[in-house]
Amino acid sequence: MAKNLSIIDRAIVGFDSSLRAIIPHSNQTARPLPVSSDALPQLSITESRHVAGLMRINHTGEVCAQGLYHGQAFTAKDDLVKQAMQHSADEEIDHLVWCETRLDELGSHPSVFTPVWYGLSFGLGAIAGIISDEFSLGFVAETEAQVSEHLQDHIDQLPEQDTRSKEILAQMNIEELEHREAALNHGGKALSAPVRISMRWMANRMKNLAYHL
């Protein structure tokens, strides 16, 4: 269907997707929260602040995923790769909304730097797509692998009674690994050690800032 759109139409659709990624409460999810109970866990003030910081990091990660996928789809050379990027971005919208919902429940908010995170990620995704589809897909695979690592770390850090956040992050982790496999199956190549290390360094800076702001 996207093939029938004019350049202007694609630009409008892309701009709309970008706005939805950075404006709170502008997306709807086709799937409910992946939780077994609607009851909110009882948390102390300190626990609530820590959980909010972790969920803000995860929300920021989903914003970055949107930027990355949108940027790669914008410059990808192969139509199948573009479709794969868009499909993954669509699934990540659910993750974005789930994190946003949990932040609301905690009386907190997304990172104030959300537009910056999105813009930087879009640029990285676009550059990766320009280099080659194989590099772009490898970039996705490595990103998802690193996201899975920090999701598992966050699950371990959550208070024992906060099964709500744990279930959300556990489902996200399953799907992040599926996106990694999809990227590899579409031809993604392993990245060099310097690129992987640089990605991890940038991700750590983002996490440190997003936890507080």
Curated annotation (Swiss-Prot):
Cofactor: Fe cation
InterPro entries, per the entry: COQ7_proteobact, Ferritin-like, Ferritin-like_SF, Ubq_synth_Coq7
Cofactor note: Binds 2 iron ions per subunit.
GO biological process: one example: ubiquinone biosynthetic process
Predominant localisation class: membrane
One Gene Ontology CC term in the entry: plasma membrane
Top-level taxon in the UniProt lineage: Bacteria
Listed EC numbers: 1.14.99.60
Pathway recorded for this protein: Cofactor biosynthesis; ubiquinone biosynthesis
Record keywords: Cell membrane, Iron, Membrane, Metal-binding, Monooxygenase, Oxidoreductase, Ubiquinone biosynthesis
Localization per Swiss-Prot or TrEMBL: Cell membrane
Residues annotated for Fe cation 2 binding in this entry: 92, 144, 176, 179
UniProt topology in membrane: Peripheral membrane protein
GO molecular function: 3-demethoxyubiquinol 3-hydroxylase activity; metal ion binding
Chain sites annotated for binding Fe cation 1: 62, 92, 95, 176
Reaction catalyzed: a 5-methoxy-2-methyl-3-(all-trans-polyprenyl)benzene-1,4-diol + AH2 + O2 = a 3-demethylubiquinol + A + H2O
Enzyme class, broadest EC rank: oxidoreductase
Similarity remark: Belongs to the COQ7 family.
HAMAP family: COQ7
Job of this protein: Catalyzes the hydroxylation of 2-nonaprenyl-3-methyl-6-methoxy-1,4-benzoquinol during ubiquinone biosynthesis.
Protein name as it appears in the record: 3-demethoxyubiquinol 3-hydroxylase
Classification lineage: Bacteria, Pseudomonadati, Pseudomonadota, Gammaproteobacteria, Moraxellales
